[in-house]
């Protein structure tokens, strides 16, 4: 019994010993400190060279003398390695510090400073200038250094030899003054992680630096930003996998700072506050609060060449004043000319949606070529932005005569009353000299033509089937509004992919009413001008030239087949899309017409329906074509599609004859802009 009790006591004492030893060891191997100023902490910072702790609590690494170095290390080594029977890893650690660099002058600055992991709390015989108080010419690049430094560099290149220094950058250095990785000094905007904000290390203002090393992933994050921001950017400047660090770090390392100046290139380097943590879970660097630190040093950078600068400023200001006077003269003359040129004529008073030319000139940045987003048969289209409005598209038209201006403006003003979700909205117009300007809503995704052909050719992105089918139904809805639902009948006369614009939600907008005509209900159209685009024009137009809603239906049918097949309606007069699809239909192979770029990514029922409706719309007899209301019911599945009768087709010879009659009589307009969209499938 006594023996068992003795064994129990021995076992208990042994376990207690193990627990206490592990606890003490954990405390001994964990390092945490925070210096919010260095007054009262002189014994904890080992300084060498030009470094000193000033009475105001600032740690100054160097003054602005030439060719000096300064180092400041925490007085105790930090245990950074974890060893077990299988491997060796580096413990997680983090550090944050606020520093200030004040150059001697704007042209005399350098060289920078480092945060360093070193096997010793000093850097014996370290060189100045490009060596930054860490290395010298003899040991530079020596793997026996066991030094890792994060370099804050302010000098481009070196006066002694060619180096990798790019100036105002952060670098990661392993045993060498040559950086393995360099990044120009920026911080990332928290509202837009892709937006970079640059700043200067030697600005004389406090800058916060945060370093975070995750031992589990071997990832090192480095973040720098002006301390005045008061918050930490969520995206670091450097986020780098650094397995090479394991070759550098020894069992115990010293942490601290080094700095140097060069010959004729010198800055004062200060550290206002510093915190460090290692040995626990992955630590997050503490952001130091600027108000809790000593005041920053005064920025006493010398103003060189003051007298010459004053002279230069006087000359420059005189030149600027002269230029401003000349510009003011021309501006007054320009305003005077504008006032004379914008006199209203009698016919313009009835159309109150007139915009000022000067506003459109400013909105389009002077109608520069860089603002062109498309061209068409009636003019050029520019992107613009009026104050307090969404972007606009401005079409600049040059009419052939003053009579043409009157008729065209009256026509456009009537069309400007059209309002439908599948039509491009006309906001207004302007007349300036012989130019007519039409102002539309700006549609960001460009034309259906570009999405069907240009975008796939450039990027390989193919318009998805679902997007195509919804676009087809949207165009049909817009044409139904023009033909039946507005107070007058509107015949578009130029329905084609380049006149269909796609908005940000992939809704189609039928636009470019340059050829459109209005008719009172119950009247017949009368025109002798044959207009439209080859491939989309109904066959009866070659006989009488009179457009009708049925000729718009024909053009829609061709457009619908083009959307499904991904092919142009005609090719050099040898291929006709409508005849090709009809031939496949007659052979029972109509699904072979579907755009092969879709692969299997389409709905067979919807595709078969769309092809059948397209063929019905292309019937050679206008009276046999369905109205747009019936077309929309077909596409929505609200009515069954009838069989195509034997009188549908016409021969290729008649088609060729029809095409030859059109040569020389056809105009074409389009607004084309290429843009990517999330609804385009790869």
UniProtKB/Swiss-Prot annotation:
UniProt enzyme class: transferase
Assigned EC number: 2.7.11.1
One example GO MF annotation: protein serine/threonine kinase activity
Binding-site list for ATP: 373-381, 395
Top-level taxon in the UniProt lineage: Eukaryota
UniProt region (Legume-lectin like), positions on chain: 29-277
Disruption phenotype: Slight enhancement in abscisic acid-inhibited germination. Redundant with LECRKA4.2 and LECRKA4.3.
GO BP, one annotated term: pattern recognition receptor signaling pathway
Xref: Gene3D superfamilies: 2.60.120.200, Phosphorylase Kinase, domain 1, Transferase(Phosphotransferase) domain 1
InterPro entries named among the record's database cross-references: ConA-like_dom_sf, Kinase-like_dom_sf, L-type_Lectin-RKs, Legume_lectin_dom, Prot_kinase_dom, Protein_kinase_ATP_BS, Ser/Thr_kinase_AS
Record-annotated membrane-spanning stretches: 311-331
Annotated keywords: ATP-binding, Cell membrane, Kinase, Lectin, Membrane, Nucleotide-binding, Plant defense, Receptor, Serine/threonine-protein kinase, Signal, Transferase, Transmembrane, Transmembrane helix
Expression (tissue specificity): Strongly expressed in the vascular system and trichomes of the leaves. Also expressed in guard cells, anthers, stigmas and germinating seeds, but not found in petals or roots. Increased susceptibility to the bacteria Pseudomonas syringae, characterized by stronger necrotic symptoms and higher bacterial proliferation.
Membrane side Cytoplasmic: residue ranges: 332-682
Primary location class: membrane
Signal sequence coordinates: 1-26
Reactions performed catalytically: L-seryl-[protein] + ATP = O-phospho-L-seryl-[protein] + ADP + H(+); L-threonyl-[protein] + ATP = O-phospho-L-threonyl-[protein] + ADP + H(+)
Membrane protein topology class: Single-pass type I membrane protein
Catalytic residues, chain numbering: 494
CDD domains registered for this protein in UniProt: lectin_legume_LecRK_Arcelin_ConA, STKc_IRAK
UniProt subcellular location: Cell membrane
Extracellular topology ranges: 27-310
Function, as annotated: Involved in negative regulation of abscisic acid response in seed germination.
Protein's name in the database: L-type lectin-domain containing receptor kinase VI.2
Source organism (scientific name): Arabidopsis thaliana (Mouse-ear cress)
Lineage: Eukaryota, Viridiplantae, Streptophyta, Embryophyta, Tracheophyta
Name of the gene: LECRK62
């Amino acid at each position: 019994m006594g023996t068992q009790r003795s064994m129990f006591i021995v076992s208990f004492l042994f376990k207690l010993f193990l627990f206490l030893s592990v606890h003490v060891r954990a405390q001994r191997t964990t390092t945490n400190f925070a210096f919010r100023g260095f007054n009262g902490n002189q014994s904890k910072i080992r300084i060498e060279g030009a470094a000193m702790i000033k009475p105001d609590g600032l740690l100054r690494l160097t003054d602005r003398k030439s060719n000096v170095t300064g180092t400041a290390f925490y007085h105790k080594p930090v245990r950074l390695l974890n060893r077990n029977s299988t491997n060796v890893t580096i413990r997680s650690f983090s550090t944050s510090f606020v520093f200030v660099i004040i150059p001697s002058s704007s042209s005399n600055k350098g060289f920078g400073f480092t945060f360093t992991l070193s096997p010793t709390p000093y850097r014996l015989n370290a060189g100045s200038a490009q060596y930054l108080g860490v290395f010298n010419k003899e040991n530079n690049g020596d793997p026996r250094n066991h030094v890792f430094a994060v370099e804050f560099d302010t000098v481009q290149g070196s006066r002694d030899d060619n180096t990798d220094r790019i100036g105002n950058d952060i670098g990661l250095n392993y045993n060498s003054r040559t950086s393995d990785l360099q990044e120009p000094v920026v911080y990332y905007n928290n509202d837009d992680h892709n937006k970079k904000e640059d700043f200067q290390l030697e600005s004389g203002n406090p800058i916060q630096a945060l370093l975070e090393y995750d031992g589990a992933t071997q990832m090192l994050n480095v973040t720098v930003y002006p301390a005045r921001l008061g918050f930490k950017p969520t995206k670091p400047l450097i986020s780098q996998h650094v397995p090479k660090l394991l070759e550098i770090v020894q069992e115990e390392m010293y942490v601290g700072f080094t700095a140097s100046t060069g010959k004729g290139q010198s800055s004062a380097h200060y550290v206002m506050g510093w915190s460090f943590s290692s040995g626990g879970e992955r630590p997050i660097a503490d952001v130091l609060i600027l108000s809790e630190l000593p005041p920053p040093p005064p920025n006493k950078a010398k103003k060189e060449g003051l007298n010459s600068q004053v002279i230069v400023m006087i000359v420059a200001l005189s030149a600027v004043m002269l230029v401003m006077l000349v510009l003011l003269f021309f501006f007054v003359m320009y305003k005077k000319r504008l006032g004379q040129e914008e006199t209203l004529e009698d016919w313009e008073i009835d159309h109150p949606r007139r915009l000022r030319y000067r506003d459109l000139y400013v909105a389009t940045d002077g109608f520069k070529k860089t603002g062109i987003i498309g061209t068409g048969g009636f003019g050029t289209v520019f992107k613009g932005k009026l104050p307090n409005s969404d972007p606009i598209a401005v079409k600049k038209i040059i009419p052939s005569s003053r009579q043409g201006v009157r008729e065209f403006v009256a026509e456009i003003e009537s069309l400007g009353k059209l309002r439908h979700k599948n039509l491009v909205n006309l906001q207004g117009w302007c007349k300036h000299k012989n130019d007519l300007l039409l102002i539309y809503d700006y549609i960001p995704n460009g034309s259906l033509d570009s999405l069907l052909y240009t975008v796939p050719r450039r990027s390989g992105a193919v318009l998805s089937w679902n997007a195509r089918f919804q676009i087809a139904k949207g165009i049909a809805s817009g044409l139904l509004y023009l033909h039946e639902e507005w107070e007058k009948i509107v015949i578009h006369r130029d329905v084609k992919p380049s006149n269909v614009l796609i908005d940000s939600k992939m809704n189609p907008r039928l636009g470019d009413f340059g050829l459109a005509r209005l008719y009172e209900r119950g009247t017949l159209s009368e025109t002798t001008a044959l207009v439209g685009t080859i491939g989309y024009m109904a066959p009866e137009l070659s006989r009488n030239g009179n457009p009708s809603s049925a000729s718009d239906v024909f053009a829609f049918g061709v457009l619908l087949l083009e959307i499904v097949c991904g092919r142009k309606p005609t090719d050099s007069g040898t291929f006709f899309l409508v005849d090709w699809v009809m031939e496949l239909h007659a052979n029972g192979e109509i699904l072979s017409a579907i755009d092969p770029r879709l692969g299997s990514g389409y709905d067979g029922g919807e595709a078969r329906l769309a092809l059948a409706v397209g063929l019905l719309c292309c019937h050679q007899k206008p009276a046999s074509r369905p109205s747009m209301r019936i077309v929309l019911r077909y596409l929505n599945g609200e009515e069954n599609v009838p069989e195509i009768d034997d009188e549908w087709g016409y021969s290729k010879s008649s088609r060729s004859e029809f095409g030859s009659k059109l040569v020389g009589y056809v105009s074409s307009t389009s607004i084309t802009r290429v843009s990517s969209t999330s609804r385009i499938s790869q």
